[in-house]
Amino acid sequence: MSAVNAQTKYDEGRLMQVLVAPIVSEKATMIAEKSNSVTFKVLQDATKYEIKAAVELMFKVNVKAVAVLNIKGKTKRFGKSVGRRDNLRKAYVTLQAGQELNLGGESA
C-alpha cells in the first residue's frame, strides 16, 4: 500500500490519531538497530492496515510489515488502595530496506 492509496482509503484525521507515542526503551532501541523497526504505542482499536497507513502518511517512508502486541495492564497496590495500569497496544513497524525513521529530532 502506498502513501497515496492510504490517504484515499482511510480518513486522514483518524490516521493522525492512530499513533499515540513512540516507545523509546532499551529493547525498542535494540530491535530498531537489529531489524530496521520502530516501536509505537497505538490506539486499542487500531488495525495493522491503519498503523501502516498512518506511518507512511506521517513519516513518508515505506513500511514492510507491522506486528501488533496487546499488553494487559498490571494491578498495583499502594497501601490499602488497589489500582490498575491501563492496557497497552504496541506496534512494531518494520521499514523497507534503505528506509530510515529518525524520532530523535536531530538532523544528519
Swiss-Prot record:
Subunit structure, as described in the record: Part of the 50S ribosomal subunit. Contacts protein L29, and trigger factor when it is bound to the ribosome.
Species assigned in the record: Polaromonas naphthalenivorans (strain CJ2)
Entry-linked HAMAP family: Ribosomal_uL23_B
Role played: One of the early assembly proteins it binds 23S rRNA. One of the proteins that surrounds the polypeptide exit tunnel on the outside of the ribosome. Forms the main docking site for trigger factor binding to the ribosome.
Protein name: Large ribosomal subunit protein uL23
Key words, A-Z: Ribonucleoprotein, Ribosomal protein, RNA-binding, rRNA-binding
Encoding gene per record: rplW
GO biological process terms, semicolon-separated: translation
UniProt GO molecular function: rRNA binding; structural constituent of ribosome
